[in-house]
């Protein structure tokens, strides 16, 4: 059971690194910045933080 948790944590970390790498590649393209009143820039980090909190609460 303990090794399964460790494998799941490793898989989650790899997925987070992969998603952040994809986000950095997408950020290098020319695109207009969101307006200051838009919450679009905060959506992705908030999503990752929520998923990480739920996963750690579920595992531990």
From Swiss-Prot:
Topology term for the membrane: Lipid-anchor; GPI-anchor
Record-listed Pyrrolidone carboxylic acid modification sites: 28
Organ and tissue specificity: Expressed in reproductive tissues. Expressed in chalaza, funiculus, stigma, septum, style and transmitting tract.
Propeptide feature ranges: 39-60
Covalent lipidation (GPI-anchor amidated serine), chain numbering: 38
Keyword annotations: Cell membrane, Glycoprotein, GPI-anchor, Hydroxylation, Lipoprotein, Membrane, Proteoglycan, Pyrrolidone carboxylic acid, Signal
GO CC annotation terms, alphabetical: plasma membrane; side of membrane
Post-translational modification: Contains 4-hydroxyproline; hydroxylated on Pro-32, Pro-34 and Pro-36. O-glycosylated on hydroxyprolines; noncontiguous hydroxylproline residues are glycosylated with arabinogalactan.
Endpoints of the signal sequence: 1-27
Subcellular location: Cell membrane
Principal subcellular localisation of the protein: membrane
Residues bearing attached sugar chains per UniProt: 32, 34, 36
Positions where 4-hydroxyproline occurs in the chain: 32, 34, 36
Function statement: Proteoglycan that seems to be implicated in diverse developmental roles such as differentiation, cell-cell recognition, embryogenesis and programmed cell death.
PANTHER family in UniProt: ARABINOGALACTAN PEPTIDE 1, ARABINOGALACTAN PROTEIN 12
Entry similarity comment: Belongs to the AG-peptide AGP family.
UniProt name for this protein: Arabinogalactan protein 12
Organism: Arabidopsis thaliana
Higher taxonomy: Eukaryota, Viridiplantae, Streptophyta, Embryophyta, Tracheophyta
């Amino acid at each position: 059971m303990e090794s399964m948790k460790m494998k799941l944590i490793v898989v989650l970390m790899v997925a987070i690194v992969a998603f952040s790498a994809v986000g950095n590649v997408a950020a290098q393209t020319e695109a207009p910045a969101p307006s200051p009143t838009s919450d679009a820039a905060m959506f992705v980090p908030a999503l990752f933080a929520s998923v990480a909190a739920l996963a750690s609460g579920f595992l531990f």
